[in-house]
Amino acid sequence: MPTASGSRVWGSRTWLGSPSGRPSHDDPVLGRIGGPDVGVIVLGSANHDTSVSMPRIPGPGETILATGAASGPGGKGLNQAVAAARSGASTTFVGAVGDDEAGERLRGVLIEEGVRAGLGVSERPTGTAFVMVADDGENAIVVVAGANGDGAAITAEAASALASAGSGDLVLAQLEVPLDAVLSAFRSAKERGATTVLNAAPSRPLSDDQLALVDVLIVNQHECLDLAGAPVEGVAGAAVADAARLLAARVGTVVVTLGSEGALVLSAGEATRIPAFPVTAVDTTAAGDTFCGALVSRLAAGDPLAAAVPFASAAAALCVQRSGAAASAPRLDEIMELLESRAWSA
């Protein structure tokens, strides 16, 4: 698949960097990122998820019979941290849990995944999410924030984690935790020369001053339109592209995930469309989170954005073929196998 400059990023492992696997490089937009000591710090939510499988999502006032239920770790932040670690990044997760059994289980999950856990303990209970998953892979989610809403606990843990951050490190956050905690972490990251990545989900208004703290913005189609102030009664391709250009003028680098249509990347005044991998979705719950975690893992490894986005798309394609949230994130060898098995171009 050609990049905006015409060079290919598919076909061999060479696009993943030098033989050491962790080179550094000067990205024309993001500056110097990647290297042997580069780490990923993910700030965000951690939930105990209860997922229910069903033929379709019920309408208001409707009762339907489920076909199964399961519980496991989730939350956008935790999902992204696990995805980054499984993709090969040295990863730290910053968040908050309650002083309860669910919080201890989430701490154990992070340890098992090799993720350093900066978990503040809140007086509030651990966050909980209830996920409805239809047979076609679509989902509807209700979240009880709990400890994820404890901005003071999260900010304290972030300050500790960021104390050793430096140039080349990446800090990834979402908006399932208090905005003040995210902005505080990004200010500290920028002061230390780290690269900031914001997955603006769930969507909320952000000022120009707030977006100035963001180096890379990741949104889906609806979030793109909403954040740009465009009408959201539909996701026509032209409207999304126009909204993405408006955001790129405020941020610089914007990645819009388009579901089965791939991703749109706007950077350095150029737009690049990256196709998706055609797969049959089983559960799309953690697709976006897996994309974000995999993307920052490759930026940390030294890949340019033009290579990191296809890698993230491959990771998301594997993710949606499995059930669950954090548990559905693929590992590096699986992603590489998919990339090497698909000799296609755009």
Residue ranges and their predicted role:
Residues 168-242, 261-263:
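Conserved beta-alpha-beta core of the PfkB/ribokinase-like small-molecule kinase fold
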Residues 96, 121, 131-170, 175:
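Conserved phosphate-binding/catalytic loop of the ribokinase/pfkB sugar-kinase fold
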Residues 114, 149-156, 196-203, 275-276:
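Short gly/ser/thr-rich secondary-structure transition/capping motifs
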Residues 161-165, 210, 247:
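Structural alpha-helical scaffold elements that stabilize or flank donor/cofactor-binding regions
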Residues 10-96, 101-111, 129, 281, ...:
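Glycine-rich phosphate/adenosyl-contacting loop at the front of the ribokinase-like
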Residues 109-123:
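A glycine-rich helix N-cap at a beta->alpha junction
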Residues 10, 15-16, 20-21, 25-38, ...:
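Conserved phosphate-binding/catalytic region of the ribokinase-like
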